[in-house]
Amino acid sequence: DINKLDQIIAGKHTSPAYTMKSFSNTPFLVEESVFSTYDDFKDLLEVCFATDKDDLIASLKDSGLRGRGGAGFPTGMKWEFCKDQEVSTKYVVCNADEGDPGAFSDRYLMEEQPLKVLFGMVICAYIIGSKQGFLYIRGEYPESITITNDSLAKLRELGLLGDNILGTGFDFDMNVVEGQGAYICGEETALIASIEGRRAEVDVRPPFPVVEGLYKKPTVVNNVESLAAVAAIFKLGSEAYKSIGNGRSLGTKLISLDGYFNNPGLYEVDLGTPISFIIDEIGGGFNDDIKALQIGGPLGGIVPVDILKTLTLDFEAFSEGGFLLGHASFVCIPKSFSAVEYAKHLFAFTAHESCGKCFPCRLGSVRGK
């Protein structure tokens, strides 16, 4: 707020308190008591190492986990595709380039629950046969980078990362790559190009990264929340995990509510939760007159208030409505703000952030602006 600039400079202005809480019947992602210590990490790793890899894949597929970064592709199927590639060198990549305005779920997990994310990477590497992983973390998240590096160092010290993990003969290590500030790097092929030191441009698919990804080798790319959810599945069991949700979309989802809510913050909810419940009961209603919500980032779609009354938080409902769930960031558009001006802003954003490779985006975003 420009009117409070003097207060901010003087350090007298305080931002509204943000809440982190789970509203799920089976909390995991924001619940430290379930899985948060290095002993938890070791114990669950030992259980997984004693289980056949095909059984682990079957459990992951049975859980119904789908990518939490936007596309919603079945995670178990992605890992299985990569595992089946008969190539000696494979990679695991964590997409932590959280660039959607209003989204901070990935940042929360990396700074408050890093072991859940790192466990997902280690067990993915074990299943697909990878020896090297990369965490591509948004450059604007210095604390996330520091905490992740500290956690990696501790895992190496405890023998939970590096050579011969837990005496199993399994070797795996990972490194942090600092993002370069481009929104397009949130797209998996552009992210891969950035890790390789190339210009961050999207690649034509197929081949998909699970067949030909980083350095032209089979690669699993998952976002932060997807990897953290893997730890939940192997900790709670696939039956318990898939019992959460509405039968179509399973498990829990982190949502980010902005400052137009009376209770702004980050919350864990069951997929299938009515948006009206999120607004009224979790968010405490709005503190201003709102005309619409931008959910899932600048490309996720604008949801009018009247549609919110019947919409549920799940992949199918959003797809049927022509929206994209994405990171499930809730950005409010007040009635006092012109919808035309907001649309212009979105086109300007996409025109600025487009990598320029594909002409519909390169030309369309500029014309829209």
Locations of regions flagged by a protein language model:
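Feature of Fe-S/electron-transfer and energy-metabolism proteins
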Residues: 1-369
